[in-house]
């Protein structure tokens, strides 16, 4: 009985991953959501909108270790909860 209980606890810990990984949207299409589990250490979800004249809005979304910054690109929106963007 103790062995069964211990096995269940271990399986639960492995399956739940103790909440150490973030889930972010990985789709580059604004109206589509594609949740993706981030790698360890990547705890920020980000989204960068690129205006494209005559076309739909282009987005880049994903996981990051910190909020991306680049003066040549539009400002990134960042957050630190699952599926927040």
UniProtKB/Swiss-Prot annotation:
InterPro entries to which the protein is assigned, alphabetical: Snake_3FTx, Snake_toxin-like_sf, Snake_toxin_con_site, Toxin_cobra-type
PROSITE patterns in the cross-refs: SNAKE_TOXIN
Subcellular location per the Swiss-Prot or TrEMBL entry: Secreted
One Gene Ontology cellular component annotation held by this UniProt entry: extracellular region
UniProt cross-references to SUPFAM superfamilies, sorted A to Z: Snake toxin-like
GO molecular-function terms, A-Z: toxin activity
Tissue specificity note: Expressed by the venom gland.
Keyword Cytoplasm (UniProt): no
Predominant cellular place of this UniProt entry's protein: secreted
S-S bridge residues: 24-45, 38-63, 67-78, 79-84
Gene3D superfamilies: CD59 (2.10.60.10)
Keyword vocabulary terms for this entry: Disulfide bond, Secreted, Signal, Toxin
Residues making up the signal peptide according to the UniProt record: 1-21
Keyword Metal-binding: no
Family indicated by similarity: Belongs to the three-finger toxin family. Short-chain subfamily.
Protein name, as recorded: Three-finger toxin MALT0044C
Species in which this protein is naturally found: Micrurus altirostris (Uruguayan coral snake)
């Amino acid at each position: 009985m103790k062995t069964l209980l211990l096995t269940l606890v271990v399986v639960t810990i492995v399956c739940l991953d103790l909440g150490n990984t973030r889930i972010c949207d990985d789709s580059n299409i604004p109206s589509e959501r594609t949740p993706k589990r981030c790698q360890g250490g990547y705890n920020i979800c980000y989204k960068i909108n690129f205006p494209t004249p005559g076309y739909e809005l282009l987005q880049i979304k994903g996981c990051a270790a910190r909020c991306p910054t680049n003066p040549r690109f539009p400002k990134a929106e960042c957050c630190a909860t699952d599926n927040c963007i």
